[in-house]
Amino acid sequence: MRALSFVFVAAVGVSALSILSARDGGLPFSGAALREIARIENEIDKIESESLIRLGSLPDNQVQQIELLGKLLLYDKELSVNRNEACAFCHMPEAGFTGPIAEFNRTTGSYPGSVRTRFSERKPQTHAYAPLSPVLHYNEGQGDLVGGNFWDMRATGRRLGNPAAEQAEGPPTNPVEMGLSDFSCAVYRASRRPYRALFESVWGAQAFAIDWPSDTDAVCNRPGPPPADDPSPVHLTSVDRGRAAATFDQMAQSIAGYESSHEVTAFTSKYDAVQAGKSQFTAQEQQGYDLFRGKAKCNECHRDGGPGEEPMFTDFTASNIGTPANPDLPFYAEGEPDARGYVANKRGQSFVDLGVGGFLADGHPLSQPSAVDARWKPLASQNLGRFKVPTLRDVDKRPMPDFVKAYAHNGYFKSLKQIVHFYNTRDVLPRCAPHDPREGTACWPAPETTDNMNKSKVGNLGLSSEEEDALVAFMQTLTDGFVPAARQ
Protein backbone atom coordinates (compact mmCIF):
# COMPACT_ATOMS: atom_id res chain seq x y z
CA MET A 1 0.00 0.00 0.00
CA ARG A 2 2.86 2.35 0.76
CA ALA A 3 4.27 1.85 -2.74
CA LEU A 4 0.82 2.65 -4.11
CA SER A 5 0.89 5.94 -2.21
CA PHE A 6 4.23 6.73 -3.86
CA VAL A 7 2.72 6.15 -7.31
CA PHE A 8 -0.18 8.46 -6.60
CA VAL A 9 2.02 11.26 -5.29
CA ALA A 10 4.41 11.06 -8.19
CA ALA A 11 1.52 11.10 -10.62
CA VAL A 12 -0.44 14.02 -9.27
CA GLY A 13 2.02 16.23 -7.43
CA VAL A 14 1.87 18.77 -10.25
CA SER A 15 0.58 21.64 -8.13
CA ALA A 16 3.31 21.04 -5.56
CA LEU A 17 5.92 21.14 -8.29
CA SER A 18 4.45 24.28 -9.86
CA ILE A 19 4.58 26.12 -6.54
CA LEU A 20 8.33 25.63 -6.41
CA SER A 21 9.00 25.79 -10.13
CA ALA A 22 10.30 29.33 -9.71
CA ARG A 23 12.06 28.61 -6.43
CA ASP A 24 15.33 30.15 -7.57
CA GLY A 25 13.74 33.18 -9.18
CA GLY A 26 11.54 34.91 -6.64
CA LEU A 27 8.35 34.29 -4.74
CA PRO A 28 6.34 31.55 -6.48
CA PHE A 29 3.00 32.55 -4.96
CA SER A 30 -0.37 33.48 -6.38
CA GLY A 31 -1.64 37.01 -5.99
CA ALA A 32 -4.12 35.79 -3.39
CA ALA A 33 -1.36 34.20 -1.32
CA LEU A 34 0.82 37.32 -1.54
CA ARG A 35 -2.07 39.51 -0.41
CA GLU A 36 -2.78 37.22 2.53
CA ILE A 37 0.91 37.08 3.50
CA ALA A 38 1.01 40.89 3.50
CA ARG A 39 -2.19 41.04 5.55
CA ILE A 40 -0.85 38.65 8.18
CA GLU A 41 2.53 40.42 8.33
CA ASN A 42 0.73 43.74 8.91
CA GLU A 43 -1.46 42.17 11.58
CA ILE A 44 1.60 40.75 13.32
CA ASP A 45 3.26 44.18 13.24
CA LYS A 46 0.14 45.75 14.75
CA ILE A 47 -0.08 43.21 17.58
CA GLU A 48 3.63 43.61 18.28
CA SER A 49 3.33 47.42 18.37
CA GLU A 50 0.37 47.26 20.74
CA SER A 51 2.28 44.87 22.98
CA LEU A 52 5.39 47.06 22.99
CA ILE A 53 3.30 49.97 24.28
CA ARG A 54 2.60 47.89 27.38
CA LEU A 55 6.32 48.02 28.24
CA GLY A 56 5.66 51.53 29.54
CA SER A 57 3.34 50.30 32.28
CA LEU A 58 4.49 46.85 33.29
CA PRO A 59 2.39 44.82 35.71
CA ASP A 60 3.97 44.02 39.08
CA ASN A 61 2.91 40.39 38.73
CA GLN A 62 5.84 38.37 37.37
CA VAL A 63 3.55 35.82 35.73
CA GLN A 64 1.97 38.63 33.71
CA GLN A 65 5.43 39.97 32.85
CA ILE A 66 6.43 36.55 31.52
CA GLU A 67 3.20 36.36 29.50
CA LEU A 68 3.89 39.77 27.95
CA LEU A 69 7.49 38.81 27.20
CA GLY A 70 6.35 35.57 25.61
CA LYS A 71 3.86 37.42 23.44
CA LEU A 72 6.52 39.88 22.28
CA LEU A 73 8.82 36.99 21.36
CA LEU A 74 6.02 35.15 19.57
CA TYR A 75 5.18 38.17 17.39
CA ASP A 76 8.77 39.21 16.66
CA LYS A 77 9.72 38.78 12.98
CA GLU A 78 13.34 39.72 13.78
CA LEU A 79 13.85 36.24 15.20
CA SER A 80 13.77 34.70 11.71
CA VAL A 81 16.71 34.70 9.32
CA ASN A 82 15.18 37.16 6.85
CA ARG A 83 13.36 39.14 9.56
CA ASN A 84 10.04 38.38 7.88
CA GLU A 85 8.48 35.52 9.86
CA ALA A 86 7.38 35.55 13.47
CA CYS A 87 6.28 32.37 15.22
CA ALA A 88 2.77 33.79 14.93
CA PHE A 89 2.90 33.66 11.12
CA CYS A 90 1.62 30.08 11.40
CA HIS A 91 -0.33 30.56 14.64
CA MET A 92 -2.72 33.51 14.59
CA PRO A 93 -5.57 33.94 17.10
CA GLU A 94 -8.35 34.47 14.56
CA ALA A 95 -7.67 30.98 13.14
CA GLY A 96 -7.51 29.26 16.52
CA PHE A 97 -3.75 29.85 16.77
CA THR A 98 -3.06 27.78 13.68
CA GLY A 99 -2.52 28.66 10.01
CA PRO A 100 -4.20 32.02 9.21
CA ILE A 101 -3.78 32.07 5.41
CA ALA A 102 -6.77 30.53 3.66
CA GLU A 103 -4.93 30.25 0.33
CA PHE A 104 -2.29 27.95 1.83
CA ASN A 105 -4.90 26.03 3.80
CA ARG A 106 -6.91 25.54 0.61
CA THR A 107 -3.95 24.52 -1.56
CA THR A 108 -0.67 23.39 -0.02
CA GLY A 109 -1.80 22.70 3.55
CA SER A 110 1.68 23.68 4.76
CA TYR A 111 3.31 27.11 5.08
CA PRO A 112 6.47 28.74 3.71
CA GLY A 113 9.36 29.57 5.98
CA SER A 114 11.44 32.73 6.29
CA VAL A 115 13.13 31.54 3.09
CA ARG A 116 9.84 31.73 1.22
CA THR A 117 10.60 28.90 -1.22
CA ARG A 118 11.02 26.39 1.60
CA PHE A 119 7.88 24.70 2.90
CA SER A 120 7.36 22.37 5.85
CA GLU A 121 6.02 18.87 5.36
CA ARG A 122 3.21 19.37 7.90
CA LYS A 123 0.27 21.62 8.66
CA PRO A 124 0.79 24.05 11.56
CA GLN A 125 -0.77 22.83 14.79
CA THR A 126 -2.57 25.10 17.21
CA HIS A 127 -0.47 26.24 20.14
CA ALA A 128 -3.56 27.01 22.20
CA TYR A 129 -3.79 24.50 25.05
CA ALA A 130 -0.38 23.08 24.06
CA PRO A 131 1.17 23.82 27.49
CA LEU A 132 -1.33 21.42 29.07
CA SER A 133 0.19 18.43 27.28
CA PRO A 134 2.14 16.29 29.76
CA VAL A 135 5.81 15.45 29.46
CA LEU A 136 6.13 12.54 27.03
CA HIS A 137 6.04 9.21 28.85
CA TYR A 138 5.13 5.60 28.27
CA ASN A 139 1.89 4.48 29.89
CA GLU A 140 2.36 0.81 30.72
CA GLY A 141 -1.35 0.23 31.25
CA GLN A 142 -2.33 1.67 27.87
CA GLY A 143 0.76 0.48 26.04
CA ASP A 144 1.04 3.96 24.55
CA LEU A 145 3.30 6.98 24.52
CA VAL A 146 1.43 9.93 26.02
CA GLY A 147 2.21 13.66 25.84
CA GLY A 148 4.82 15.76 24.11
CA ASN A 149 4.21 18.35 21.41
CA PHE A 150 4.52 18.50 17.62
CA TRP A 151 2.64 16.07 15.40
CA ASP A 152 5.36 13.47 16.09
CA MET A 153 5.68 14.19 19.85
CA ARG A 154 9.38 15.03 19.47
CA ALA A 155 9.16 18.04 21.82
CA THR A 156 9.12 15.66 24.75
CA GLY A 157 9.35 18.21 27.56
CA ARG A 158 11.75 15.99 29.46
CA ARG A 159 14.58 18.54 29.48
CA LEU A 160 12.65 21.71 30.33
CA GLY A 161 9.71 20.06 32.06
CA ASN A 162 7.30 21.52 29.51
CA PRO A 163 6.69 20.20 25.98
CA ALA A 164 5.38 23.61 24.86
CA ALA A 165 8.67 25.27 25.78
CA GLU A 166 10.69 22.65 23.94
CA GLN A 167 8.35 22.98 20.95
CA ALA A 168 9.09 26.73 20.87
CA GLU A 169 12.79 25.95 20.37
CA GLY A 170 12.18 24.05 17.14
CA PRO A 171 11.06 26.61 14.54
CA PRO A 172 13.87 29.22 14.96
CA THR A 173 16.54 26.80 13.72
CA ASN A 174 14.37 24.75 11.37
CA PRO A 175 15.64 25.54 7.83
CA VAL A 176 12.10 25.33 6.40
CA GLU A 177 10.62 27.55 9.12
CA MET A 178 12.39 30.54 10.70
CA GLY A 179 15.70 29.39 9.26
CA LEU A 180 18.40 30.59 11.66
CA SER A 181 21.70 28.73 11.39
CA ASP A 182 22.43 28.76 15.13
CA PHE A 183 20.10 29.02 18.14
CA SER A 184 22.39 31.72 19.52
CA CYS A 185 21.28 33.94 16.61
CA ALA A 186 17.83 34.13 18.21
CA VAL A 187 19.46 35.21 21.48
CA TYR A 188 21.66 37.75 19.70
CA ARG A 189 18.71 39.33 17.93
CA ALA A 190 16.55 39.34 21.06
CA SER A 191 19.34 41.19 22.87
CA ARG A 192 18.85 44.08 20.45
CA ARG A 193 15.08 44.31 20.75
CA PRO A 194 13.00 46.82 22.76
CA TYR A 195 11.94 44.13 25.24
CA ARG A 196 15.52 43.46 26.41
CA ALA A 197 15.00 45.29 29.71
CA LEU A 198 11.84 43.28 30.41
CA PHE A 199 13.70 40.06 29.63
CA GLU A 200 16.51 40.99 32.04
CA SER A 201 13.98 41.98 34.70
CA VAL A 202 12.30 38.59 34.44
CA TRP A 203 15.30 36.33 33.93
CA GLY A 204 18.26 38.31 35.29
CA ALA A 205 20.81 40.83 34.03
CA GLN A 206 23.19 38.05 32.98
CA ALA A 207 20.82 36.82 30.24
CA PHE A 208 22.54 38.80 27.48
CA ALA A 209 25.98 39.18 29.06
CA ILE A 210 27.59 37.56 26.04
CA ASP A 211 30.67 38.65 24.09
CA TRP A 212 29.39 38.44 20.52
CA PRO A 213 31.93 37.95 17.69
CA SER A 214 32.19 40.81 15.21
CA ASP A 215 30.78 38.66 12.39
CA THR A 216 27.63 37.61 14.28
CA ASP A 217 25.34 39.79 12.17
CA ALA A 218 26.70 38.33 8.94
CA VAL A 219 26.52 34.76 10.23
CA CYS A 220 22.96 35.18 11.45
CA ASN A 221 21.87 36.67 8.12
CA ARG A 222 22.78 33.41 6.34
CA PRO A 223 19.96 30.85 6.24
CA GLY A 224 20.43 27.52 7.94
CA PRO A 225 21.30 24.79 8.08
CA PRO A 226 24.89 25.50 9.10
CA PRO A 227 27.77 23.89 7.21
CA ALA A 228 28.44 20.30 8.23
CA ASP A 229 31.99 21.23 9.25
CA ASP A 230 30.81 24.24 11.31
CA PRO A 231 27.61 23.21 13.13
CA SER A 232 27.77 26.17 15.54
CA PRO A 233 28.72 29.03 13.20
CA VAL A 234 28.44 31.77 15.84
CA HIS A 235 31.84 31.17 17.41
CA LEU A 236 31.29 31.78 21.11
CA THR A 237 33.43 30.73 24.03
CA SER A 238 32.13 27.70 25.89
CA VAL A 239 30.97 29.96 28.73
CA ASP A 240 29.11 32.30 26.39
CA ARG A 241 27.56 29.42 24.46
CA GLY A 242 26.31 27.97 27.71
CA ARG A 243 24.82 31.32 28.65
CA ALA A 244 23.21 31.66 25.21
CA ALA A 245 21.71 28.19 25.58
CA ALA A 246 20.25 29.10 28.97
CA THR A 247 18.79 32.32 27.56
CA PHE A 248 17.33 30.45 24.58
CA ASP A 249 15.62 28.13 27.06
CA GLN A 250 14.24 31.16 28.89
CA MET A 251 12.92 32.60 25.63
CA ALA A 252 11.10 29.33 25.01
CA GLN A 253 9.76 29.18 28.56
CA SER A 254 8.43 32.73 28.14
CA ILE A 255 6.60 31.74 24.97
CA ALA A 256 5.10 28.75 26.77
CA GLY A 257 4.05 31.11 29.55
CA TYR A 258 2.14 33.25 27.06
CA GLU A 259 0.58 30.17 25.47
CA SER A 260 -0.62 29.18 28.96
CA SER A 261 -2.32 32.54 29.49
CA HIS A 262 -6.05 33.13 29.39
CA GLU A 263 -5.49 35.05 26.15
CA VAL A 264 -4.53 31.82 24.37
CA THR A 265 -5.72 28.91 26.51
CA ALA A 266 -9.05 30.44 27.38
CA PHE A 267 -11.69 27.77 28.11
CA THR A 268 -14.37 30.27 26.99
CA SER A 269 -16.29 28.20 24.43
CA LYS A 270 -20.02 27.57 24.30
CA TYR A 271 -19.26 24.04 25.47
CA ASP A 272 -17.65 25.48 28.62
CA ALA A 273 -20.64 27.78 29.15
CA VAL A 274 -23.01 24.81 28.84
CA GLN A 275 -21.00 22.80 31.36
CA ALA A 276 -21.12 25.78 33.73
CA GLY A 277 -24.90 26.02 33.37
CA LYS A 278 -24.71 29.38 31.58
CA SER A 279 -26.00 28.27 28.18
CA GLN A 280 -27.70 25.39 26.40
CA PHE A 281 -26.89 23.38 23.28
CA THR A 282 -29.26 23.55 20.35
CA ALA A 283 -30.99 20.30 19.48
CA GLN A 284 -28.45 19.67 16.69
CA GLU A 285 -25.48 20.45 18.94
CA GLN A 286 -26.83 18.12 21.63
CA GLN A 287 -27.33 15.38 19.04
CA GLY A 288 -23.72 15.90 17.95
CA TYR A 289 -22.46 15.72 21.53
CA ASP A 290 -24.38 12.49 22.11
CA LEU A 291 -22.92 11.03 18.91
CA PHE A 292 -19.45 12.28 19.88
CA ARG A 293 -19.65 10.33 23.13
CA GLY A 294 -21.42 7.33 21.63
CA LYS A 295 -21.95 6.00 18.12
CA ALA A 296 -19.19 8.09 16.48
CA LYS A 297 -16.58 7.02 19.09
CA CYS A 298 -14.87 10.44 18.96
CA ASN A 299 -14.58 10.63 22.74
CA GLU A 300 -12.39 7.52 22.85
CA CYS A 301 -9.43 9.62 21.63
CA HIS A 302 -10.69 13.22 21.83
CA ARG A 303 -11.59 12.88 25.50
CA ASP A 304 -13.78 15.53 27.06
CA GLY A 305 -12.39 14.73 30.47
CA GLY A 306 -13.04 12.37 33.33
CA PRO A 307 -13.35 13.08 37.05
CA GLY A 308 -10.94 15.87 37.98
CA GLU A 309 -9.73 16.30 34.38
CA GLU A 310 -9.90 19.41 32.24
CA PRO A 311 -12.00 18.71 29.12
CA MET A 312 -9.10 18.85 26.65
CA PHE A 313 -10.66 16.88 23.77
CA THR A 314 -7.50 14.84 23.33
CA ASP A 315 -6.01 11.92 25.22
CA PHE A 316 -2.47 13.06 24.26
CA THR A 317 -1.72 9.75 22.52
CA ALA A 318 -1.04 9.17 18.81
CA SER A 319 -3.05 7.45 16.10
CA ASN A 320 -2.92 6.64 12.38
CA ILE A 321 -6.40 7.44 11.04
CA GLY A 322 -5.34 6.50 7.50
CA THR A 323 -5.08 10.03 6.12
CA PRO A 324 -4.20 10.01 2.41
CA ALA A 325 -0.96 11.62 1.30
CA ASN A 326 -1.41 15.28 0.37
CA PRO A 327 0.09 15.52 -3.13
CA ASP A 328 -0.11 19.32 -3.00
CA LEU A 329 2.55 19.61 -0.31
CA PRO A 330 5.43 21.59 -1.85
CA PHE A 331 7.74 19.46 0.29
CA TYR A 332 7.52 16.71 -2.36
CA ALA A 333 9.20 19.10 -4.79
CA GLU A 334 12.01 20.00 -2.39
CA GLY A 335 14.15 17.05 -3.40
CA GLU A 336 16.62 19.15 -5.39
CA PRO A 337 19.04 21.81 -4.08
CA ASP A 338 17.49 25.25 -3.77
CA ALA A 339 19.30 28.48 -4.65
CA ARG A 340 21.41 28.09 -1.51
CA GLY A 341 22.19 24.42 -2.12
CA TYR A 342 19.86 23.10 0.56
CA VAL A 343 17.81 19.94 0.04
CA ALA A 344 14.92 19.81 2.52
CA ASN A 345 13.47 16.50 1.34
CA LYS A 346 16.11 13.94 0.47
CA ARG A 347 13.42 11.35 -0.39
CA GLY A 348 11.73 13.59 -2.94
CA GLN A 349 8.53 12.17 -4.41
CA SER A 350 8.94 8.95 -2.41
CA PHE A 351 8.65 10.77 0.92
CA VAL A 352 6.26 9.17 3.42
CA ASP A 353 5.66 10.89 6.74
CA LEU A 354 6.01 8.18 9.39
CA GLY A 355 5.07 10.45 12.28
CA VAL A 356 5.90 9.32 15.81
CA GLY A 357 7.52 6.14 14.53
CA GLY A 358 9.81 8.14 12.27
CA PHE A 359 10.88 10.31 15.18
CA LEU A 360 11.54 7.31 17.42
CA ALA A 361 13.54 5.55 14.71
CA ASP A 362 15.60 8.42 13.32
CA GLY A 363 14.93 11.64 15.20
CA HIS A 364 13.69 14.58 13.15
CA PRO A 365 16.23 16.12 10.75
CA LEU A 366 14.67 19.58 10.41
CA SER A 367 14.58 20.92 13.93
CA GLN A 368 16.32 20.98 17.25
CA PRO A 369 14.41 19.15 20.02
CA SER A 370 14.76 15.65 18.61
CA ALA A 371 16.60 13.60 21.20
CA VAL A 372 15.11 10.11 21.42
CA ASP A 373 15.11 8.18 24.68
CA ALA A 374 16.97 4.97 23.81
CA ARG A 375 14.39 3.00 25.80
CA TRP A 376 11.70 4.13 23.36
CA LYS A 377 13.44 3.11 20.13
CA PRO A 378 11.92 -0.40 20.23
CA LEU A 379 8.51 1.32 20.12
CA ALA A 380 9.24 2.82 16.69
CA SER A 381 7.61 0.06 14.64
CA GLN A 382 4.33 0.19 16.57
CA ASN A 383 4.20 3.97 16.09
CA LEU A 384 4.94 4.20 12.36
CA GLY A 385 2.32 6.36 10.69
CA ARG A 386 0.87 7.57 13.97
CA PHE A 387 0.43 11.28 14.77
CA LYS A 388 -0.48 13.01 17.98
CA VAL A 389 -4.23 13.27 18.57
CA PRO A 390 -4.91 17.03 18.37
CA THR A 391 -7.18 18.90 20.72
CA LEU A 392 -10.52 19.81 19.14
CA ARG A 393 -10.72 23.06 21.04
CA ASP A 394 -10.93 25.97 18.57
CA VAL A 395 -10.96 23.42 15.73
CA ASP A 396 -13.50 25.56 13.85
CA LYS A 397 -12.30 29.01 14.94
CA ARG A 398 -11.95 31.18 11.84
CA PRO A 399 -12.08 34.89 10.99
CA MET A 400 -15.06 34.55 8.64
CA PRO A 401 -17.53 31.80 7.69
CA ASP A 402 -16.00 31.06 4.27
CA PHE A 403 -12.40 30.97 5.57
CA VAL A 404 -10.82 27.60 4.65
CA LYS A 405 -9.04 25.65 7.37
CA ALA A 406 -6.96 22.53 6.78
CA TYR A 407 -7.02 19.42 8.96
CA ALA A 408 -4.83 16.36 9.72
CA HIS A 409 -1.04 16.31 9.92
CA ASN A 410 -0.55 17.14 6.24
CA GLY A 411 -3.53 19.44 5.71
CA TYR A 412 -5.24 16.98 3.36
CA PHE A 413 -8.77 17.73 4.60
CA LYS A 414 -10.29 21.15 3.91
CA SER A 415 -13.38 21.19 6.14
CA LEU A 416 -14.71 19.62 9.30
CA LYS A 417 -17.49 18.00 7.30
CA GLN A 418 -14.91 16.37 5.01
CA ILE A 419 -12.81 14.89 7.80
CA VAL A 420 -15.92 13.68 9.67
CA HIS A 421 -17.11 12.04 6.44
CA PHE A 422 -13.69 10.38 6.14
CA TYR A 423 -13.88 8.99 9.67
CA ASN A 424 -17.32 7.68 8.78
CA THR A 425 -16.61 6.16 5.34
CA ARG A 426 -12.86 5.48 4.98
CA ASP A 427 -13.43 1.72 4.77
CA VAL A 428 -16.79 1.91 3.00
CA LEU A 429 -16.03 3.92 -0.12
CA PRO A 430 -13.74 2.58 -2.87
CA ARG A 431 -10.20 3.79 -3.50
CA CYS A 432 -9.37 6.40 -6.12
CA ALA A 433 -6.44 8.54 -7.16
CA PRO A 434 -5.92 11.97 -5.60
CA HIS A 435 -7.79 14.76 -7.42
CA ASP A 436 -10.32 12.29 -8.80
CA PRO A 437 -13.57 14.31 -9.28
CA ARG A 438 -15.34 11.87 -6.93
CA GLU A 439 -12.71 12.19 -4.21
CA GLY A 440 -14.10 12.88 -0.76
CA THR A 441 -17.68 12.06 -1.63
CA ALA A 442 -17.76 8.74 -3.51
CA CYS A 443 -14.18 7.51 -2.97
CA TRP A 444 -10.98 8.11 -1.00
CA PRO A 445 -7.30 7.84 -1.97
CA ALA A 446 -5.23 5.16 -0.27
CA PRO A 447 -3.76 5.96 3.15
CA GLU A 448 -0.29 7.49 3.15
CA THR A 449 0.71 4.40 5.10
CA THR A 450 -1.35 1.53 6.49
CA ASP A 451 1.14 0.81 9.28
CA ASN A 452 -0.67 0.71 12.63
CA MET A 453 -3.84 2.12 11.08
CA ASN A 454 -6.72 2.61 13.49
CA LYS A 455 -9.43 0.21 12.34
CA SER A 456 -11.51 -0.03 15.51
CA LYS A 457 -12.58 3.61 15.83
CA VAL A 458 -12.35 4.94 12.27
CA GLY A 459 -13.61 3.87 8.88
CA ASN A 460 -17.16 2.54 9.08
CA LEU A 461 -19.22 4.40 11.68
CA GLY A 462 -22.58 4.06 9.97
CA LEU A 463 -23.46 7.74 10.33
CA SER A 464 -26.00 9.50 8.15
CA SER A 465 -25.13 12.83 6.51
CA GLU A 466 -27.36 14.54 9.08
CA GLU A 467 -25.45 12.88 11.90
CA GLU A 468 -22.17 14.04 10.37
CA ASP A 469 -23.58 17.58 10.32
CA ALA A 470 -24.57 17.26 13.98
CA LEU A 471 -21.01 16.28 14.91
CA VAL A 472 -19.72 19.35 13.08
CA ALA A 473 -22.26 21.53 14.89
CA PHE A 474 -21.06 20.18 18.23
CA MET A 475 -17.39 20.75 17.42
CA GLN A 476 -18.24 24.34 16.51
CA THR A 477 -19.28 24.83 20.15
CA LEU A 478 -15.61 24.35 21.12
CA THR A 479 -14.65 27.78 19.71
CA ASP A 480 -13.39 30.17 22.40
CA GLY A 481 -14.83 33.65 22.79
CA PHE A 482 -18.45 32.63 23.29
CA VAL A 483 -20.55 35.16 25.20
CA PRO A 484 -23.64 33.64 26.85
CA ALA A 485 -26.90 35.47 26.27
CA ALA A 486 -27.95 37.66 29.18
CA ARG A 487 -30.57 36.06 31.38
CA GLN A 488 -33.99 37.71 31.12
Give the predicted meaning of each segment.
Residues 2-5, 15-488:
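Periplasmic c-type cytochrome electron-transfer domains
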